[in-house]
Amino acid sequence: MNDKTLNNTLLDGRNFLDICLNFHNNKKYKLLSPPKATVVIPLYNCEKTISAALHSVQYQNLSEIEIILVNDFSNDNTSKIINNYQKNDHRIKILNNFKNMGTLYSRTIAVLISKGEYIFNLDNDDLYFDKDVLDYIYKRGKNENLDIISFQAIKIWNYTADIINMLNIFTYQYQEEQYVKQPELGTWMIKHKEKFVVHNNMIWDKCIKSSIYIKAINLMGFKRYSKFLSWAEDTSINFVIFNIANNFKHLKKYGIYHFMGINTASFTQPTNSKLFGEIFFLDILFDFSRNNTYDKNLIIGQAIYIYKRYQFYNFINDTNNFSYLKGVLNKLINCKYLSKLNNRKIRKLFTYFYII
């Protein structure tokens, strides 16, 4: 894409962004059955952003969709806002959590009742880039029989009048479309995370075939996805999905404006929540990796990361994470899957934690 084409693309995206932010939608929509795609949006106290996010979905050229909103026990005006939108848009389904459950659970219960062939996950403060996003990606997935499709993103640091001056493009190092199939696909996502930029492990920049997504959820199991998880939740479910999918394709298509405010998880999550997410991901890596050298290195690498990142953490005052990490580490060192050398490495690292 040359500079002129890129500038025209960004201008089209800016015009669509202005519409989503500044014009209220009173149009009535009917649910067409069966929907071609499902858009899942988890909600928590998002009264300031959910209208624009919904507009970016409603204004899509692909109208044969369902929109599943999961209200994660919000205590602001989120519920009132989405109920008003549902009156005019019969494609909207609303699920209400009985307590704050987190995004992994919220997305999961929506996917399990979805009717679309493909699933798009949208954060409640994100917006689609232009009106052609869903239609273009759905058709590419359908025509090429793709299980996972990822697309380009633009990050926004604030909703402001001069927002166009604050756009920062996620530039992928891949200059062409990328296609990967099994057996390389299982570990490709994490193996290339540096080359493929920091958000490759995220769920919001991907479209996933619903049958694959549901299979991954069932493999993960209710006991796991019902845990309150506010860190590494996307990475964990993505790893399972990538392990069972047949193929993956990255498209050179700008698909989403991703909000990167100071209140996002990377800035606000307490240390114990981040640690729980990292242990959860280590557990997922062990249970869903395959018996090959690279997968073993992923497991050891995650264990070493936890040690280095949390070696001065006070586990005495965090019995939940202490017990969880102890259980996962004991599972690792007592298995035949990892070599004796790796088992000794893990044991040596965590001896001084009095965990193993």
Residue ranges and their predicted role:
Residues 179-270:
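Conserved nucleotide-sugar donor-binding catalytic segment
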Residues 1-24, 146, 312-356:
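Membrane-interface aromatic/basic loop that binds lipid-linked glycans or pyrophosphate carriers
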Residues 132-171:
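Conserved donor NDP-sugar-binding/catalytic core segment of glycosyltransferases
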Residues 55-64:
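Short, acidic, metal-binding catalytic loop of nucleotide-sugar glycosyltransferases
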Residues 119:
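Short aromatic/hydrophobic "clamp" motif used to bind/position activated sugar donors
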Residues 71-80, 99:
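A conserved acidic beta->alpha catalytic loop
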Residues 1-56:
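N-proximal low-complexity "stem/linker" segments adjacent to membrane-targeting elements
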Residues 97-114, 124:
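Glycine-rich, basic loop-to-helix element that forms the pyrophosphate-binding segment
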